[in-house]
């Protein structure tokens, strides 16, 4: 680094002189064109390499940033496509769930209607059986009352007719009946 500074000091001394100050020398022979060309060559060679290096680094940085931006854009496009696909799948799934819910509700409705109809038919059967049972009980009670009344009337008649004349007449008719069947 010191050699570079020494070289630069020597070049400035050669080009600008010692204390004359900075100014434009219009005399071509005094300006030492060779020294100027050397200084310009050194500046261009050192500065050019540094400038070229800076420009190359900047170019590589810009290219890397562009590649990274392209990669991010591709990733964003892929994520967007995946999100759209997921949205379509979710919408399809939601539609299927709505349709399935409608179908299930209709099935439940039909099942409830059938069950209500079956319950009504069963209740109608129970009602008819109850009516038949009540009719049978009523008929049984009426029959028992008729029989009891008939027996009561027969007893009454037997008691009324149980006098001795009736017994004599029944006994005589039974004797006559058995005498016909002598063996």
Swiss-Prot record:
Entry similarity comment: Belongs to the ATPase B chain family.
Keyword tags: ATP synthesis, CF(0), Chloroplast, Hydrogen ion transport, Ion transport, Membrane, Plastid, Thylakoid, Transmembrane, Transmembrane helix, Transport
Subunit structure: F-type ATPases have 2 components, F(1) - the catalytic core - and F(0) - the membrane proton channel. F(1) has five subunits: alpha(3), beta(3), gamma(1), delta(1), epsilon(1). F(0) has four main subunits: a(1), b(1), b'(1) and c(10-14). The alpha and beta chains form an alternating ring which encloses part of the gamma chain. F(1) is attached to F(0) by a central stalk formed by the gamma and epsilon chains, while a peripheral stalk is formed by the delta, b and b' chains.
Pfam families linked to this entry: ATP-synt_B
Superkingdom assignment: Eukaryota
Primary location recorded for the protein, binned into one broad class: plastid
Function recorded in the entry: F(1)F(0) ATP synthase produces ATP from ADP in the presence of a proton or sodium gradient. F-type ATPases consist of two structural domains, F(1) containing the extramembraneous catalytic core and F(0) containing the membrane proton channel, linked together by a central stalk and a peripheral stalk. During catalysis, ATP synthesis in the catalytic domain of F(1) is coupled via a rotary mechanism of the central stalk subunits to proton translocation. Component of the F(0) channel, it forms part of the peripheral stalk, linking F(1) to F(0).
Protein source organism: Oltmannsiellopsis viridis (Marine flagellate)
Transmembrane segments: 33-51
A GO molecular function held by the record: proton-transporting ATP synthase activity, rotational mechanism
Additional record remark: In plastids the F-type ATPase is also known as CF(1)CF(0).
Subcellular location: Plastid, Chloroplast thylakoid membrane
Membrane topology: Single-pass membrane protein
The protein, known as: ATP synthase subunit b, chloroplastic
Annotated Gene Ontology cellular component terms: chloroplast thylakoid membrane; proton-transporting ATP synthase complex
Alphabetical list of InterPro entries matching this protein: ATP_synth_b/b'su_bac/chlpt
